[in-house]
Amino acid sequence: MRRIAFLLALAGLALGPAGCGDRNMVLTVNLLSFIAPADRSGGYGPIPAGLVGTSVDLIDQDVTLLPGLSSVVDVESATLRIGMRFENQTGSASGHVLVYLAPSDSTSAFGVPPLADIPVTLAPNDTVQVATEIASSPALSAALTQEHARLGVRVSFDTTGSLSVLQGSETTEELLGIVVTKRSL
């Protein structure tokens, strides 16, 4: 019995400092919560077969992120989780889901380079789930620690291999920013 108590105490001492987090703070920003439920889904098409680079803007909206954060903390890492569902009805296409976070004074979210470029392939009468996590980068860290930003999601379709018109619907299911910070000294 004493041996078990000793092992439990030893495990507690070993794991205690690990839970402290070295004064890190993890902040989660549900970007999807800024988008009205009716605006999280939309249709695309009809897009004729044989076209390259047909873009459909799904989201272009102002969001409030983490007010005052950048002046009191240093960002250790930032990630962005993205989840979408495409319910394609007709036609086929390859494409790219592009995610943008522009400064809030921008007239459009699409005036800056995308933070994410996710490939997607659509076939007739098929449902495709797209899910990815964008790793930390200076651009992502800067974007997620602004007070306000303009969020954009665009899909670019290439229907050159399709024999029929591309048409279907898209639902954005997850846009989650995770920022790990450390207090500035």
Residue ranges, per PLM feature:
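Short, surface-exposed beta-strand/strand-loop-strand elements in extracellular ectodomains
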Residues: 90-111
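Cysteine-clustered segments with highest specificity for TGF-beta superfamily mature ligands
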Residues: 120-170
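Short, low-complexity, Pro/Ser/Thr/Gly-rich segments in the mature regions of secreted, periplasmic
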Residues: 172-185
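Sec-dependent bacterial lipoprotein signal peptides
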Residues: 1-20
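Bacterial Sec signal peptide processing site at the extreme N-terminus
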Residues: 15-35
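Short beta-strands within extracellular/lumenal beta-sheet-rich domains
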Residues: 49-72
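Post-signal peptide N-terminal segment of mature Sec-exported envelope proteins
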Residues: 28-51
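A short beta-strand element within beta-rich, extracytoplasmic domains
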Residues: 73-91
